[in-house]
């Protein structure tokens, strides 16, 4: 009985740790959780929010332009890869 309890507790801990590691990966941009990635649809034409993701690794700006998250100098929020400028 003690061995079975040990196995169950070990499995539960393993699942908990694996889930926590996934959550830590998602926290790389905590302020941008739920934001829309570059190239995805956004804005009122699609009935979606306009909050495009900021990517602090790149210079430039990113925003919702004509219903798609694109990069450009006049977009409202910082951070986009200029090589993917829309």
Swiss-Prot record:
Disulfide bonds join 35-53, 42-62, 52-71, 64-69. It is found in: Secreted. The keyword Disulfide bond applies. Residues 21-33 form a propeptide. Keywords: Disulfide bond, Ion channel impairing toxin, Knottin, Neurotoxin, Secreted, Signal, Toxin, Voltage-gated sodium channel impairing toxin. One of its GO terms (cellular component) is extracellular region. It comes from the Eukaryota. GO terms for molecular function: sodium channel regulator activity; toxin activity. Expressed by the venom gland. Residues 1-20 form the signal peptide. Toxin active against S.frugiperda larvae. May act on sodium channels (Nav). Belongs to the neurotoxin 39 family. The presence of a 'disulfide through disulfide knot' structurally defines this protein as a knottin. This is U2-sicaritoxin-Li1a.
